[in-house]
Amino acid sequence: MKLINQNQVEFFQGSVAYDAGKVFFFESRVFRGIFSDRYAQMYNQFLKEKWIDEIFEAGLVHTVVSDDIKLEGALITLEHKKIPFMTHPAERTPYSFWLSAKTLVRVNLLLSQHGYVLIDAHPWNVMLEKGNPKFIDFTSVYRSNRISRDWFEEFKKYFCIPIWLSSNQWHEFSREYRREHLNGFGLKLFETRFLHKIFSFLMGFGRVIGDPVNFLRQLDKWLDEHRPKKNLSADWPEYPQYEIAQNPLDSVLPKEKFILEVLRAEKPVTVLDCAANKGHYSEIAALLGASVASFNYEEQCVDECLLLAQKKNLDITPVVMDFKLPTPPHSIGLLYGSAYKRFKSEIVIALGLVHHLCIFQRLPVHIFCKICMKYATKGILFEYVDPTDSQVKSWGKQIPDNYSIEGFNSYFNTKFSKSKISKIINDNGSKRVIVYYFS
């Protein structure tokens, strides 16, 4: 057993206010020191229960009492399974967010059958692991035979309202509501007496809150009745992503072969796939052993990627985000980092993207490059689409002066001094090259 001093570890600032314990990071692992005798005894017993694996399978983050690390001053030191990427509630699709609510209720239901409940019910404690929601606030577990009314009010405020909006196909309103933390127009609006009446039917659940199992089953039924309807206002879900080979790692296409060559050589631990569509290149990176954050601005594409991760048990975290508008830091004191911090990865993949942004949408070339470099620590896999490409020519748009392979080289080389370039991909009117920038 290795005893470590508190000065040797990095504490997660968001947990320092809790009496139960403090989350800290050490040697790329996630721990929690428990300093309260009452909580230490409770969690020691909880983790020895014969049904504990059922709770983990339902969605509580997998946790053990560490057998090799002990934090000085802590009565026990827990180790949590590490979640590769932290996500914001507004980065979830309506379906993914609904799954998070279902997971939270399911975990609480199973706990309540064994004399425990959850104290907290907000979405900042639910993350994604291989496409599956995981409730990460282990010290929200508490021995009790009653669900608190505060838990129900928090669940209504942060889960029921945005889910109700999505179930009525008000997807953008739902996402904007989820962007807000403690204050905001949406949160204030739904506190008004008029709109409060919309959710009066939920108040009936309060009559059975003293019977946790019955209460949570009714809440779960409400969620089933309000499963979000698919957002049909999308442009890219039918965009083909190559699946020539049954195994993506066996592809013979020049573009994929170059990408495979780079990823196999570099062996990145983390990868960010920008504008990933349905996640084809995310799958390739994950199959090669990387933890992958995969984002797209269209919800249907992200849901396809989510289902891919679940079906194939891939370490992919699919989120909704616009490349041009990374999620800013949030929470009290901005303790939860921006997208730049949370999705920072060794290699950034930016394929089939630059011409849409820099030519069609007029995003300045230097800003495109700056955004990519903000995420990347080791290198960038970049697809350059030439102005003579048939798709670009069909738009009839003016080409920016610095939109050239030389222009991109000059910007990317400020951080990554070396580069490797593929052969020109010239097929059916396309003219593109893949460049790997690295140091």
Where do the language-model regions lie?
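Conserved ATP-binding subdomain of kinase catalytic cores across diverse folds
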Residues: 1-119, 129, 162, 166-190
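Catalytic activation segment of kinase domains across protein kinase-like and atypical kinase folds
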Residues: 117, 122-168
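Conserved class I S-adenosyl-L-methionine
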Residues: 268-277
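Conserved SAM-binding loop of SAM-dependent methyltransferases across substrates and taxa
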Residues: 278-290
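Conserved SAM-binding motif I beta-strand of class I
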Residues: 291-296
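S-adenosyl-L-methionine
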Residues: 306-342
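A short, conserved alpha-helix within the catalytic core of class I
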Residues: 357-371
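Conserved beta-strand signature within the Rossmann-like core of class I S-adenosyl-L-methionine
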Residues: 374-386
